[in-house]
Amino acid sequence: VGVWENYKLYLDRGESLSQWHRRVPSYFTFDDHELVNDIWGSAETGKRHRRTVFRDIGTQAWFDYLGWANPTEHHHPIHFGKATMRRDSDLLYDQNADFSKMPLSEMGNLHVHWGTPEAGVNDMQYDNDSGNKNSYVYDIIEVIDPHTLRLHMPAKVDDTSVSYSIGRRSYGKTRVGNCEFYFIDTRGDRQMHDVTQRDKPGVSMLGKPQREWLLRSMKESDADFRFVISTVPFMIPHSGAGGFEADAANKDEAWTGFFDEREALIAEWEKIGKRVFVMTGDLHNSFAIKVTDNVWEFCCGPHNSVNHVPVNDESDRPATGKFKFGPRECDIRWSSYILPDLPRLERLYPYFCFVQVNNVLKMPKKFGGKRLVAYPNPQVVFQYYNGRTGELAYAESISTER
């Protein structure tokens, strides 16, 4: 209940936030804080961690309050249920479910929930092994009958009241003019990264179904510009927590923990030959990065959080200039940047990004009239503004290939 109460509390108390939601049509995508902080490995078969199996609870609350308006490729909701599991048996039985009618090939994997009151609390003291003994990430092997599933491994203990869920696929796309927008899910089908082997083949943030959908859709589109909405940074590591507690031994929220998949995406985007803009967040800084001539990253950090310190939290990347972390060098054209001598509560420099697509120029035959003429090469202008003063801090204009 606490997750839903959080949304209600912020909307009740945040009058300006409520007005925004009431008056401005918006699309949203979720990251870890919409579920639970640092939620990793939701698709890592056999993983046991209280944050990991909180995925569907947090995702359902997000859909109830924000995600209901989003375009989605698959519409079947999360399935929640109570089931029976028997020790050493790989069967899960739910008398109230009809698994034969569920489009399981279009849904996620199965999680048995942690079951403690603190399961969704952002506090590392609860990252222990006190949860339900059968709480793991499970692959569904087959439907035995309408009420029974075979899972990839047997239960650890007998339990006649297992709280479980089968996830949904939360990605989708929409088209506005000559721009295609792809809203990807970076948490729901995410395998477990390993910062000691960032280029491990096959480790995926998206999962095979989503990755194949994304690349197929992007190749089939005739849009001039493709916007990929990713909740986590593409080129800059998120390797610190800004002074908060974190799993320092394996901390990285970004695509820099998934080099194999990231580089495969870039290679396929280069084949398309059109502009691809990866719109990212999560890090508490903003930046504009040229990855290739066609692929760019534009990150906008949160508006109400202290900034990260790049020296500590972003693998000591520069404010501008060439930066290489892993197999690919990129060009940081601009960024917000905080020096480490600032006290934590002085690190409050938000920026917001306004994206303007210029397809036509105004050219009336008579002054005051109306006529629009198409540009031979449309352009997209990314404008970063200081969140405190409203002043323009940086702009980057990118046109179609000439």
Residue ranges and their predicted role:
Residues V1-R402:
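Long, structured stretches of catalytic cores involved in phosphate-ester chemistry, encompassing
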